[in-house]
């Protein structure tokens, strides 16, 4: 078990959406294969949440813009003396390939949105207890089909997200690795700094401190207030060391 815990906080709406998409796709993959009612509901609930997030904006356009922006950044890095040119070229190729695949793919989420079973389950999830067998006989039948049939259908659903997921994974890896962790110290539970056009804050705390950060701000400036997990009996030290990366 790790002695430290990592917190990530988006500094703009674009990054907030991307982190939610990443989280939901991870949740969808967590309990596969689907072999029982509970894991099915976990999967379909996350599919519904993912479609809700995707429908709020033009995810593909934002990802394509970011893929292009990352290519320009790498072009600048390529001119730095002593840089690993092979590594730069490899990442640039991945960015170009991901952009080509994403541009050629259907609208993000369209395949899931048009699926009849997903649509039926999505409607019933908003009703407390609305996914009983008498409410959703189609799901009841689906869960009694062979595991191979269910696996094949889930594979198609997950595969439809792959162009977006590949682009998103590549972008988030580059963002997360764009800045190192540096030791910082908060005074009386408070810390603030300039964002320097960052998209994402990454913060590491000792698990033994039993503290969590409340973060507010945007790409230009941010503030962090540390709060005790036990709000009644916990306390925050006058000086607290932590690790911070502005990515």
Swiss-Prot record:
PANTHER family: CELL DIVISION PROTEIN ZAPD. The lineage of its organism: Bacteria, Pseudomonadati, Pseudomonadota, Gammaproteobacteria, Enterobacterales. Keywords: Cell cycle, Cell division, Cytoplasm, Septation. Coiled coil: none annotated. Its main location: cytoplasm. NCBIfam families: PRK05287.1-1, PRK05287.1-3. Interacts with FtsZ. Pfam families: ZapD. It comes from Enterobacter sp. (strain 638). This is Cell division protein ZapD. It is found in: Cytoplasm. Belongs to the ZapD family. The keyword Cytoplasm applies. One of its GO terms (biological process) is division septum assembly. One of its GO terms (cellular component) is cytoplasm. The keyword Ion transport does not apply. InterPro entries: ZapD, ZapD_C, ZapD_sf. SUPFAM superfamilies: YacF-like (SSF160950). Cell division factor that enhances FtsZ-ring assembly. Directly interacts with FtsZ and promotes bundling of FtsZ protofilaments, with a reduction in FtsZ GTPase activity.
């Amino acid at each position: 078990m790790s002695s430290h815990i990592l917190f990530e906080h988006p500094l703009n709406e674009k990054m907030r959406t991307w982190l939610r998409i990443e989280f939901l796709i991870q949740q969808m993959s967590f309990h596969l294969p689907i072999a029982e009612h509970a894991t099915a509901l976990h999967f379909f609930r996350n599919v519904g949440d993912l479609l809700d997030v995707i429908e709020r904006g033009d995810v593909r356009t934002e990802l394509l813009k970011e893929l292009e922006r990352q290519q320009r950044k790498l072009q600048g890095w390529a001119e730095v003396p002593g840089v690993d040119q092979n590594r730069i070229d490899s990442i640039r190729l991945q960015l170009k390939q991901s952009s080509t695949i994403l541009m050629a793919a259907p609208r993000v989420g369209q395949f899931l949105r048009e699926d009849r079973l997903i649509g039926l389950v999505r409607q019933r999830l908003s009703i407390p207890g609305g996914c009983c067998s008498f409410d959703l006989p189609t799901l009841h039948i689906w869960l009694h089909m062979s595991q191979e049939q269910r696996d094949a259908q889930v594979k198609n659903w997950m595969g439809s997200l792959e162009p977006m997921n590949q682009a998103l994974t590549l972008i988030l890896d580059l963002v997360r690795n764009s800045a190192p962790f540096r030791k910082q110290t908060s005074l009386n539970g408070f810390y603030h700094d300039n964002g320097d056009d960052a998209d994402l804050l990454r913060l590491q705390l000792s698990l033994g401190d039993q503290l969590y950060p409340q973060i507010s701000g945007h790409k230009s400036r941010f503030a962090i207030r540390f709060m005790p997990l036990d709000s009644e009996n916990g306390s925050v030290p006058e000086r607290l060391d932590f690790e911070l990366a502005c990515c």
